[in-house]
């Protein structure tokens, strides 16, 4: 292939890749806890015969915008706002532990607690609560319930959200919107 065509094609391919990342960021702008992806481009000289003015472009990696987004007050008992470098542990589709910034917790018909359709991990694995109970979340992530017929003071702890500290750059973004450690080992709870 002619070097000039190759150089032009590499620039067009990288522009398409960057456009896909921007489109994904725009599509997820209202997704709770979403972290925008950032693409960095770098020029590199084309090796071989010819003038040194021929330069190709290559993606230097995809990063993540770790800046804290606005906290939205919902007055919903199962919505949590996480601190700046705090992530919530969830179970990924393959059963491994992954992390998210989403805080819109749900309880399904079996009592399983989830966020974004993924089971929330606590002290001893995925968290479940008794069906029909009123769920309360403490500031430290403690999950307490008041079952039907119990007095208003009768809260029983059933678990604790696994919250982890993750400094920018220590986790890798997955294609499923979750974050993982580079060595796939779970992080310790805070």
Where are these regions (language model features)?
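Amphipathic alpha-helical polymerization modules
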Residues: 1-190
